[in-house]
Amino acid sequence: ASKYACQVVDPNDIYEVDMDIYAPCALGATINDITLEKLKCSIVAGAANNQLENEEKHGNEMMKREIVYAPDYLINAGGVMNCYAEVHNFSSKQVMEMAENIYNTTTEILELSKAQNIPTFLASNRIAEQRLSKESRK
């Protein structure tokens, strides 16, 4: 830990540690009524599925507390793309081109959230629904 200027803490105490980013990468529902009150970060961005115990309630509360939330399926997009690429024998270059678009999607979600004053989970759901609707009409 000292090599990276980090501090090891008990997992039960993690929510009360001052940090920039909380990255839940294993267990879902770690953002709940109890932990959200303790959370001391400005960003939640992790690979765990279903990080918010109650998406609407906790997503809205994080917005009120000015905590930026990167939805799980946005963070997981690279892994999903890689699986798809393996099945369809895409080249490394093709996979990287697909993955580079995650940044653009993240920016789009954050901008929509800000413009419409809605939580990022809702902005990402709206964008996903629009894309699925567009694809289904093809």
Give, region by region, the residue ranges found by the protein language model:
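Adenosine-phosphate binding glycine-rich loop
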Residues: S42-K138
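Rossmann-like adenosine-cofactor binding region
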Residues: A1-P71
